[in-house]
Every structure is written in structure tokens, then in C-alpha cells.
UniProtKB/Swiss-Prot annotation:
The gene is CML5. Keywords: Calcium, Metal-binding, Methylation, Repeat. PROSITE patterns: EF_HAND_1, EF_HAND_2. Ca(2+) 4 binds at D145, D147, D149, Q151, E156. Belongs to the calmodulin family. PANTHER family: CALMODULIN, MYOSIN LIGHT CHAIN 1, 3. GO terms for cellular component: cytoplasm. Ca(2+) 1 binds at D24, D26, D28, C30, E35. This is Calmodulin-like protein 5.
Amino acid sequence: MAEVEVRVRQEQVAEFRETFAFFDKDGDGCITLEELDTVVRSLGQTPTREELAEMIRDVDVDGNGTIEFAEFLALMARKASRGGENGGGGDDSGDAADEELREAFKVFDKDQDGLISAAELRHVMISLGEKLTDEEVEQMIREADLDGDGQVNFDEFVRMMMLSDQ
């Protein structure tokens, strides 16, 4: 049983690292106010600079004005132990990570049909400041698309996120 728990925790950390990387646009190991602003705005929110600064302060243990992975991991662990909004315990250790992945998937799946098309992927990448050619977007879809339908479903998305962390 302990071996299963360790594996789940390792998988969860890998999922959290991928979520962290989604925010950490320049890959320097910390989430700045500007990076947080970019992602939050891509989710359709319009926070003030003060609200963004407060979000960072809430988790910035070392007080340096950015969120490092350890601080992000601590935040995710606290969320998981609270069991989310339903008040449940933290026994379902994969639930928080699964919910994070589902939220990330929803960002890409603009029409909420359960599939990410090349056009949806292109739109999100542009809104995040990524400049990709049509060929690069299509290549990303081909690499993730296991069933060959030209789109990425949730299971393919999860697999892609897990592989990109290795």
C-alpha cells in the first residue's frame, strides 16, 4: 500500500510541476506577477495589479515577490488536504491534480466539446504569447493525438502533459 501511495504522490508532483510550468512562461523556476497576469487574463479574468500581488503574497513564503515551485507545491498540498469545496478529506490524493488538469484542458477546449482542435490550441498559445507556425501547432496535435481523429481528448491531453514533464 505504501508503494502505491508513493507512486501516486510522485505522479501528483509531476502533474503539479506541469501546471507550474504552464504559469512559468520563461522557465526560470519562478512565477512573476507578469506571468501570473498573462495566465489569469487568458482564463478570462481581469484582476488589478494589487489583486495579482495579493495572490502572490498569499503563497510567497520567502517574501521575494515570486512563487517558486516549492511554494506552489505547498499551496497545492494545502488545497488537496482541504478536499476542495466539498469539505472532503485529502484521501483522494489525485483529485486536486486531476481537477487542475481538467481546468487546464477547459482553457484549451474553447467550445467545450471535449476535444482540443488545432484552431483552439493555436488560439490559446497566441493568447499566452507563444508564436507558433501552423505546422508547429499541427505537429503538437499529431504528437498528442493517439486515436488519429486530428484532435486531442482529455486522456490524450493528460498523457501529453505527463510526458512533457519527463
